[in-house]
């Protein structure tokens, strides 16, 4: 009769965690705000890789609006990373559930 093997479960969990970490490091998302006025690229560790700002937004001199657009684009990118993480973790947990 098959039994519960805690050591095997822990080993599989560690392997799945390492795979998840690698996937997240390789994940890159892009988000924008203001109809593309500001765009941000972010990796799975939530490090900003690049940011593009339409020069017209700078010329307008509306610093407060530009700050809001940068904040919105960064928050949108962060949300996309969170969603990718949840999806990846969901797959990892379903793989472990077969062992319980």
Model regions and ranges:
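Short beta-strands and strand-coil junctions in structured, solvent-facing domains, enriched
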Residues: 37-39, 58-60, 78
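Long amphipathic alpha-helical segments used for membrane anchoring, targeting, substrate engagement
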Residues: 1-30, 79-100
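N-terminal intrinsically disordered, cationic/polar leader segments
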Residues: 28, 32-52
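A short interface-forming secondary-structure element
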Residues: 51-63
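Short, well-ordered alpha-helical segments
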Residues: 65-81
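Residue-level signature of catalytic and energy-coupling elements of molecular machines
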Residues: 13, 46, 70
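Short acidic-hydrophobic sequence patches enriched in Asp/Glu that either
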Residues: 5, 62, 69
């Amino acid at each position: 009769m098959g039994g519960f093997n805690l050591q095997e479960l822990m080993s599989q969990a560690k392997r799945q965690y390492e795979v998840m970490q690698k996937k997240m490091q390789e994940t890159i998302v892009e988000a924008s705000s203001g109809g593309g006025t500001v765009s941000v690229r972010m990796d799975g560790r939530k490090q900003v890789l690049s940011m593009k700002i339409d020069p017209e937004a700078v010329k307008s001199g509306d610093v407060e609006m530009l700050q809001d657009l940068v904040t919105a684009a960064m928050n949108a990118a962060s949300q996309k990373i969170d969603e990718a993480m949840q999806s990846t973790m969901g797959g990892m947990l379903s793989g472990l559930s077969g062992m319980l």
